[in-house]
Regions:
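Extracellular/periplasmic envelope-modification machinery, especially enzymes
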Residues: 1-190
Length: 190
């Protein structure tokens, strides 16, 4: 995220693109522009509030690049992944004390008003295992303000890796292969 994806390009393209864009500024710019933006209730657009960590910055960029802003109006709110993107008042064990998580909390009266006024609330995070403990309470608290919300997270393809595909015959690719560590995790999530 920090380099705006440039590191994934061949080195010659990195040099060219870096002369035209500042990747770090690109990633956060649009999210910052619409942060805590009040919705214009006089237009015909559906109002969507996007709340989250750096993944919300990526989602904001994606919706604008897809020109969804022609149909929807967007506002955003940033919460550090180290604070936990959770609508729970007391989660000290989940917060990084060096960041000042109370300032980025869901417990912000202006944010509550924005959640209430949105047609949809999209919450996105790089969820951590300790977030599971708070998830039920968090979802209940959000639904008390706005029942039309969607939760987004990171992807997980389990324990199958690129090397597994290289060494495994194609006819076995549809066979379920799960490591013991994945089975334990699935049982913990139940």
């Amino acid at each position: 995220h920090i380099d705006g994806g440039l590191k994934n390009l061949p080195s010659e393209k990195q040099v060219v693109y870096s002369r035209f864009i500042n990747p770090t500024k690109y990633v956060i710019r649009k999210h910052s522009e619409i942060r805590m933006k009040t919705f214009n209730k006089l237009n015909d657009k559906e109002d969507i509030l996007i709340i989250g960590d750096s993944h919300s910055e990526d989602l904001v960029n994606a919706v604008f690049e897809a020109n969804l802003n022609s149909k929807y109006e967007f506002s955003s709110y940033y919460i550090s992944v180290n604070c936990g993107v959770l609508f729970v008042k007391n989660k000290i064990d989940r917060e990084d004390s060096r960041i000042g998580c109370k300032k980025m909390s869901f417990y912000n009266e202006d944010l509550k008003k924005l959640i209430n006024s949105a047609d949809q609330v999209w919450i996105i995070s790089s969820w951590r295992k300790q977030d599971l403990y708070y998830m039920e309470e968090s979802l209940l608290n959000i639904s008390n303000l706005n029942q039309n919300f969607k939760i987004f997270g990171t992807k997980s393809f389990g324990s199958i890796s690129k090397s597994w595909y290289k060494r495994t015959n194609q006819d076995k690719w549809s066979t379920l292969v799960i490591k013991d560590s994945d089975i334990i995790l699935f049982k913990e999530l139940e």
